[in-house]
Amino acid sequence: MELDKDIQTTQKGFHCNLCHVNIPNRPSLEDHVKGKKHLHLLRLRAQRKTQEENSVFVSGFKADTSQTELKEYFQQFGLVTDVIMDKQKGVYAIVEFSESQDVQTTLAQPQHQLNGLKLRVKPREKKEFKLASRGKQDCKNTLISLDKLNFELCKAMSVNEQIQKVVESLELKDNEKKVRDLLVQLLQEVFTEFFPDCQIVPFGSSVNTFGLHSCDLDLFLDLENTKVFQARAKSSEQTGENQSEDCRSEDSILSDIDLSTASPAEILELVAVILRKCVPGVHKVQALSTARLPVVKFSHKELNLQGDITINNRLAVRNTKFLQLCSGIDSRLRPLVYTIRLWAKQKQLAGNLSGPGPLLNNYALTLLVIFFLQNRDPPVLPSVNQLKNMACEEEECAIEEWDCTFPSQPFSVPPSKNTEDLCTLLFGFFTFYSKFDFPASVVSLRDGHVLPITDFLKSDMEALKTADASSPKPKRSSAPRLGPMNVLDPFELNHNVAGNLNERTQKNFKRECCEAEKYCRSLQYQRKSAKGKSWGLVRLFAPQSEAAASSQPRAEKVLEVSVPFKPASLPESLRAQLASAGKDFRGLWFAEVCSAVQKVFNEILQCSPTEETQSLDKTDKSGSEMEVNNNRSLEDTNIQVKGEAGKKRPLSVEEGPSTFTITQAKRQRLDVDLEHPEPLHWTWTQRSRVWAGRRKVRRDLLKTSDEASKPEGGCVDMESRVTQSIVEKEEKLHDALEFKVDAEVVGGNESTKVVLRFHPSIDTAGVFQDFFHFLESFLPKMAETIMGRAEDITDMS
């Protein structure tokens, strides 16, 4: 057996540099290189290498630039498979193409511009393949052996007991809390010397009752009293002439800065100096004054702690007290949060900052648990508005003009009438979110129920216009940043705490909830195994196995393509219409998607309609016409239903098939149920292999076209030209491909999306599977691009 580059010979046998394991002899080595772990890492390394070769590094764009805008721009150079934004937002992005040749085409362009700014585009940095050390990750996370925990869980007699054991394994111990308290006292003493009357206030996981081993120590340096002290000192014109040298050195730090006028960056630099020079054991001090939330980071050697100090984070302190209150109101909250956090970490949904892509943070996950408990019947926890009404006058609180009022003590809140145990509630959590329509919903802990996405679709400017001019809370009028998952902070109501997530993470969370819900229905979850097998939480915490992953390709046999609802990527005019439509928004959006899908088939791919699109709408039998005002003048989107319901007639290519008429009427007249629109049906024919060789044709067109850097119609125009070139140059199919497409909008008890189901009716040449495979990625992206560009097209017309 010839050794490959990953295998190194040692005195005691062999060492696999890829898997970081020692192997005693050659037979064991042969087994190792054929094993699942080694083969998996080989595939993963090859995949990472391909991703690097097919990607470019992009910077220089505006901070509010969306993934959709970047994707649309770079689509003109090749098929974009993914756009990964940096976690701080607005600094850089990685644009991944389907082929490395597309990267060369992109880099060959002398200049790239987007939204008036010149982009910096360069090849993606090639990094040596390395798996993050588990030990390094664990020091920032749970620092427990899952094998050891599983052993303890299997000894438990019930799921309820297992959940309590999870809490005991993960929670901060009393000695850890005491160590943190001592460090807070030390910092208080030191900073009081320099900032008289200041306060060091701990917040976050260390004190919110959900702390984990080795979690960071978050601190808020409150300087309000110090500002008053400094103002008094100036007014009395006190001097330091009679002070000792040591006192003068300390006072000189404060005298060098006016806290009332100093910038946060200046104050943070001063905080960093004090930490470096005056606090024993502190090292690795770093002031991050340009971050979204300016902070000073530090480490303490002897205590093995990492800490953050902020100077303007009162809302976070109030959030911490809110979580403390919720834990005190009902003792079931803490065990559920610890269990669900560990489950989410094991499924790579949350907690692991080195994981793939943006993940749920622990705060967002905790709010999801609280919201679920607010929606039990009867509720386990009250809404924030209900808590506000239970507070007394002395407990009223407003921070940065946000109402943060709630009782200071749990005994002010009546106990819940809900008697469900932890086992049932955990099952209920997965059931609740497995059926949750994340794209069309906004989670509101303040209201205690879901808010429709249409309430947030108006632009900030429109919201400001409609806001009460006399309102003392202008921040309420600004809208939260919408995304695939929308979870409002209970107090800062324009902050989406899950705004960092992308569609992939939201889908993964929903999928894992569905899998967990199925498992929790089984006896393996509910009853202890009499044969000593894994049961209950042990199997629930198991990472997704390769066997489970291998079962996913079966779903590919279902000929379906989905277009997800992405309100953030829609043009402003359409967002305003959807907002006005309220609960009927799905019908309007469905019409837009169908119009875009028709344009992809009819204009971009040059498919021909063979019979009129038929709808099963409940219209008057004598005939009807449905008009939907969308205040836009898109070409070829005028679609009309006339004549008797169910009748068909041949259509010319120019007319195109459809069900709806989207006109420029000034008022809406709806003759069908837009809240639950009926399915649409198309039948198309295709006489050319328009899916074959598109990348090569696109590259050739970019090389020969004078408009390569700025195609007039963007990627939509370019894809149309690619199709036309294929139709003109390539041999046509001997027998035309004919296929049916059924379009249906779903939502409510599942994520809002348009599902397109395909049925090949004539496929003599056996090419439909290739065509469908091409459409799986091409059709949703092009439809979303067309809808996202609609406003620009209107402006140009």
From Swiss-Prot:
Compositionally biased residues, Polar residues: 627-640
SMART domains named among the record's database cross-references: RRM (SM00360), ZnF_U1 (SM00451)
Disulfide bonds: none
All copies of domain RRM, residue ranges: 54-126
Family of the protein in this entry: Belongs to the DNA polymerase type-B-like family.
Record text about domains: The zinc-finger domain is required for terminal uridylyltransferase activity. Together with the RRM domain, binds the 5'-area of U6 snRNA.
Name assigned to this protein: Speckle targeted PIP5K1A-regulated poly(A) polymerase
